Amino acid sequence: PDLLLTGRTLMGHEASKNQQLEDHYFGAIPTRVAAFMKDLEIQALELGIPVKTRHNEVAPNQFELAPIFEECNLAVDHNMLIMSLMRKVARSHGFRLLLHEKPFKGVNGSGKHNNWSLGTDTGVLLMAPGKTAEDNLRFITFIVNTLMAVYHHNGLLKASIMSATNAHRLGANEAPPAIISSFLGKQLTQVLDHIEESGNDDLVSLAGKQGMKLDIPQIPELLIDNTDRNRTSPFAFTGNRFEFRAVGSEANCASAMIALNAAVAEQLARFKQDVDALIEKGEPKISAIIEIIRRYIKECKPVRFDGNGYSDEWKAEAAHRGLDCETSCPLIFDNYLKPASIAMFESTGVMTRKELEARNEVKWETYTKKIQIEARVLGDLAMNHIIPVATEYQSKLINNVYKMKELFPAEKASQLSAENMKLIEEIARRTIFITEHVNAMVEARKVANKIESEREKAIAYHDTIAPMLEEIRYH
């Protein structure tokens, strides 16, 4: 019932064999699953949704599908259609689709990798290095401006992917941490360091009839291989795009894409203003661009991180760098209503303050209701299913102890029933704990439900009720 009503198990013991051997990840796709995938792909293509990748993932019965890239609006719509189609096709093959980010405790959960890039209306890919220094300057310009957007709106990007369900997955050793940083790879990092450390005169020189000569290092074609190594980064550059890996598996990708697109749009407008200001002071255009890029490279350096995103050292370092390290879902949503976020959305014409406030009310309310439903389901399971079975087993043990005393001398009976006595005590201790905590959880919900502010109510559910779910599960 918990899996059916909430999308995840609220109780249950971890299986003896799950993903330890990695035999599912490296194994062949089962025949029935392959038939489901084939049927799904055909129906997706009939709807005009191009898909290509199919392979096993780490957790048992976990698989991956990858659509081919499209324009952002269309790709988001197609992603929602695929989710709906998956459910329908799965049922026709005798399967059930689980889109929850963490349906089973102890095995890997699910997520989406949003591959994001920029191109012109004439087909020029702005996130790909070129063959000339000028092409590479353009490439570096857009890379650095994207990093600036991620740096200045670090908390907002995290808020755009955060939810009650995705919170189970982020920060575990299967998903990016709940700190938004960007991995660039060794070669691209060296290029940015070269620009940062070189003066304008070193990078721009006169070259006879050619005009300006740029000393931008050649970026090799092997860039993709060198930038796809760090799987712990939530926002990694992978050759000709950034891969936003923190989006939840049941999420609408629009939330993350709206925040990212608006942030980059605002940053590009700021870049144009900064360059124009230098040109007005008499600086040549190329020199002005490089000067601003150098300034940006230094400014956004805190968001660049190529190390292990799972480590405790990174959490401490991220806090030192001033990155958003908040882990409370309701508090993370506050980033939408920060002055910088409101100014960004309004200046780009994406949303007004009122629209942002309304959306946040929905986010807080949804969070509260998700935890509320889980608490109700867990309370019902514990009181009406788990405890009755536990006490029934306890009664059998007690009966066994009494019969031991009837059959054997007191000392012998005590010796033989010692383990049963320990079990009887442990069951009593655990059932008392569960009963007390379920009752406490009910009372905590009553108190929280009286709070009028959706934000404060969500915080109460996060701080008080959500931890009880794990405590009850453990016992």
What are the language-model segments listed below?
Residues P1-L99, N108-K112, L118-E361:
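Glycine-rich, acidic/polar active-site loops that bind/position phosphate-bearing ligands
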Residues P103:
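Glycine-rich N-terminal segment of FAD-binding domains in flavoprotein oxidoreductases
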Residues I293-H475:
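C-terminal amphipathic alpha-helical interaction region
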